[in-house]
Amino acid sequence: MTLLKIKVPASSANLGPGFDALGLALALYDRVELQITDAGLKIEVTDVGAGGVDDVPTDESHLVVRAFRRGCEHLGLRPPGVHLRCFNAIPHARGLGSSASAVVTGVAAAYALAEKPLDDDTLQLAAEFEGHADNAAASLLGGFVVAWNEGERFRAERLQPHHDIRPVVAVPALRSSTDATRGLLPERVPHADAAFTAGRAALAVHALTARPDLLLSATEDRLHQHYRASAYPASSELVRALRAEGVAAAISGAGPTVLALTTEGILPAGVDVTSFDVTELPIDPGGVQVAAQ
């Protein structure tokens, strides 16, 4: 029976001002082996750095399975049975795109089973699970992505990030729900704040691709981070402390992980990170990889 091996990167979204629009693929990988069987569903989950997988379902509600089923439906496939082996390294509920990675894994596996190349519908299928395309596009395409909507259609473009940028992530033990933190956002924001953040988002694209020296200014945001600061005060304080030291830091996605876009691959020695797991994560260049056996 067909065996698919999938490797998918983590991602960091928003990057400060690019709310639901900017994403960066990071070299931290979940690996999945998906085997087509005669019947039934079997799921095995192994923690290889995710920090706990006890809450991961092992039935049809598993996100990889749901995305795989949706991809198969789209492509007209009806696999008889599935055996899934998941090796999870991306921390769950930390703002590093674990759910988007799972969705991309499932959809990409369906395309591989159909022996079809990834296309625009691949992103559409993945982003529909999330409601936004920034994380999914980063895990799918790799590198630095700009995502947007055209009506109900999700779109994204991959850009080449500047070679000097060396991301560092600071991951706390605290978990955070994307739905919960989105609930902290107001329905309306002042026009001046929206205009400020739009300018910074445009600058962020330039800084990330050509001018890393502008990243400190380019990662400023008035649209979402301060509204959600109460959900993870230690992370918000770390962002403040890093920025005071000249480091371009922001909350990664919905948090609570802190992303620092450095050119040295380390954080300043004087900043207290004792309650965080700090790691340099290079930018992943290629996105999801699937091998069929």
Q: Model-predicted segments: where are they?
A:
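Short beta-strand segments
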Residues: K7-P9, A25, S139-L141, W148, ...
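Short beta-strand-to-loop capping motifs
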Residues: N149, P172, A260-E264
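Alpha/beta catalytic cores of group-transfer enzymes, especially the acyltransferase/condensing modules
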Residues: P117-I165, L242, A249-I251, G255, ...
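Active-site rim beta-loop-alpha module in soluble metabolic enzymes
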Residues: V169-S230
